[in-house]
Regions:
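Transmembrane and membrane-interface helices of multi-pass
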Residues: 2-220
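Active-site rim elements
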Residues: 51-55, 330-332, 433-434, 486-487, ...
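Membrane-interface soluble catalytic domains
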Residues: 74, 358, 504-577
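Generic recognition of well-ordered alpha-helical segments
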Residues: 89, 116, 346, 520, ...
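Active-site-proximal alpha/beta segments of enzymes that process anionic O-linked groups
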Residues: 166-427, 435-437, 528-531, 535-544
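Histidine-centered active-site microenvironments of extracellular/periplasmic hydrolases
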Residues: 314, 458, 465-505
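Acidic helix/loop microenvironments that form the catalytic cleft of cell-wall polysaccharide enzymes
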Residues: 317, 403-410, 463-476, 545-548
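Active-site neighborhood of glycoside hydrolase catalytic domains
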Residues: 417, 439-443, 447
Length: 577
């Protein structure tokens, strides 16, 4: 049977065409598997429910597969196709890891952050799943084809013809995408939306963030576009000129600049690495739980994480400045010398307790930009040292910010530094995470108890805030299944972080159960320390104000867009002059 097939394919260009189809199918399957591994869906049902959306999703993947596969007609030997397919797999794995960790995809700016991974590469395996092995199937299919098919011929005309078909298919995909998203993205007629690699098409047609682009084109498009942008980075201007319309939109959030505003109480801001709301539990975090229930606090339980590519550094930006992160890259790497509004501005001196060293997230320069006067270093992951330092300095500095690190993924450094009793069959990542949270909470215990007796702390606004969420939906589903089967009361499906704030002028306990945002922390703090007249109000709302929580002056997406422009324009430099 095999000999008959080989004999049939040996005539004319049949083997060549068969291998072309096989290679195109390999790339197409890789694109589809990427979508499935990222979103657990390939939207087959949309073929009959919403055909236009189906073709908008699949035509770009078909076109790029045809285009790359057409090169088999230009080269006799086919071994290069294995290299290409393996490179696509490597890129897919990189995209999936980054997406699972940050909920955005890689872009050119992401590569500028590689140096920040020093000491944190151990976190990567946590985001690699056994299901990712399915990506090898298209490679095995291709290798089998190379072994079976003797297709060592050239056919330039066929290559040109296929490239033409790929171009037409690409145009069809772009047109379909345009009309599907027309109600969301208003694309002017003169936009070059036929070219999915043009900046104007990416911005106008495929959305403002890097999340949309690989979805609406393909993972291969994303690699080509990221490579193009990476080459262009040294020659691109990173600045932006604020328009009159931008400035008009900012008016509700700006007061007249003055340096005379003074806070009426001290401030301690504790940024907790990877704090998710479901971990704030009497068994896991007994000290924080007791503190919440013994004092009048604001406890925002469903806080949307708004960090982007800067992850932890973005959390610090949001809490300190009331701004949101830029859409591409990290503020700490791209704009470390900008002028920023900051809570530190309001105090005579401010201090930071930083685990590790000041090279992480470019902290040395960001401390200067946030007007932090003194940096104290503690050993990475050892939160008990962090709080020992904080306990020794809070009387010296009216504003102290402390960053915890014990709960950084992959949750191994401190998981054995606690005697928390957990079931042996609990998923490993869940168990290690909860143990690290328990250890971190134990480090806060003595400090939190002092609020009952220490007059300085009693007159201090103390905020605990999670810098970002950590688990992707697939891992969260695994945890939820385990909890349901074992009747555990952890609400792991709540993909939110928390804001817990104590202040002597909070007159009762506020449990905020509706969805809020990290950007709400900044205006809430301004209110609690008596500095609501500070020149920058922030895009969020005061969490104590239930009316404001339900009548926001700006949507989250609008705030992201405007904040991106403000930072790229270094607009605050002109405000404080």
């Amino acid at each position: 049977m095999l000999q008959q097939i080989k004999s049939y394919l040996s005539k004319g260009n049949r083997a060549q065409w068969c291998f072309f189809v096989l290679f195109a199918l390999t790339i197409f399957l890789q694109c589809c598997l990427f979508h499935w591994l990222a979103f657990h869906s390939i939207l087959i049902s949309s073929l009959w429910k919403n055909p236009l959306a189906f073709w908008a999703l699949y035509l770009p993947k078909i076109s790029i597969s045809l285009f790359i596969a057409s090169f088999v007609f230009l080269f006799k030997r086919k071994g290069w196709t294995i290299v290409v397919s393996l490179l696509i797999n490597i890129w897919i794995i990189a995209e999936l890891i980054y997406f699972r960790a940050n909920r955005i995809f890689l872009d050119a700016q992401s590569f500028t952050l590689i140096s920040n991974m020093d000491g944190f590469w151990s976190s990567v395996p946590m985001y690699m799943y056994s299901s990712d092995l399915i990506l090898l199937l298209p490679n095995l299919l291709l290798i089998s084809g190379i072994i079976f098919l003797a297709a060592e011929k050239r056919n330039t005309l066929s290559a040109i013809a296929i490239m033409g078909v790929a171009l037409v298919t690409n145009i069809g995909g772009c047109l379909a995408t345009r009309y599907v998203y027309d109600t969301i993205y208003k694309v002017p007629q003169d936009k070059n939306y036929f070219n999915p690699f043009s900046d104007e098409a990416v911005d106008a047609l495929f959305g403002f963030t890097s999340l949309e682009y690989p979805i609406n084109t393909s993972v291969v498009h994303a690699f080509i576009y990221a490579t193009k942008k990476l080459i262009q980075l040294p020659f691109e201007s990173t600045s932006y000129m604020m328009t009159d319309e931008d400035k008009q939109l900012l008016e509700p959030f700006i007061n007249v600049y003055t340096s005379n505003i003074k806070p009426d109480r001290n401030l301690i801001l504790i940024i907790v690495e990877s704090l998710e709301t479901w971990a704030v539990h009497p068994k896991i975090m007994p000290n924080l739980w007791k503190f919440i229930h013994e004092h009048n606090v604001i406890w925002a339980q469903k806080v949307e994480s708004q960090t982007k590519g800067g992850t932890s550094s973005d959390g610090q930006l949001i809490f300190n400045t009331g701004l949101l992160p830029i859409q591409h890259g990290a503020v700490c790497k791209r704009y470390p010398h900008n002028t920023f509004p900051s809570l530190s501005d309001l105090y005579e001196n401010a201090a930071l307790v930083q685990p590790g060293d000041l090279s992480v997230w470019n902290q040395k320069y960001m401390s200067d930009s946030y007007h932090i006067d003194t940096n104290y270093l503690s050993p990475q992951s050892l939160d008990h040292v962090t709080f020992t330092i904080l306990d020794s300095i809070y009387r010296l500095h009216p504003y102290c910010m402390a960053i915890t690190m014990a709960t950084h993924s992959p949750f191994l450094a401190c998981s054995k530094m606690t005697k928390l009793d957990l079931p042996d069959n609990m998923p490993e990542n869940m168990s290690n995470y909860l143990r690290c949270m328990h250890y971190s909470d134990s480090c806060w215990g003595v400090f939190l108890k002092k609020v009952n007796t220490d007059l300085v702390l009693q007159n201090t606004t103390i905020c605990f805030m999670g810098d970002h969420i950590i688990f992707d939906p697939n891992m969260r589903n695994t945890f939820a299944t385990y909890c349901a089967e074992n009747q555990l009361d952890y609400d792991v499906n709540s993909a939110h972080t928390a804001i817990i704030t104590y202040s002597p002028n909070i007159d009762k306990k506020y449990i905020v159960s509706e969805t809020t945002y990290q950007m709400d922390a900044y205006p809430t703090i301004l209110h609690l320390i008596g500095c609501e007249d500070y020149y920058w109000k922030g895009f969020g709302v005061n969490l104590l104000d239930s009316v404001a929580r339900n009548n926001r002056p700006i949507s989250e997406q609008e705030a992201f867009v405007l904040s991106d422009k403000i930072i790229r324009a270094n607009w605050f430099e002109s405000v404080v002059k």
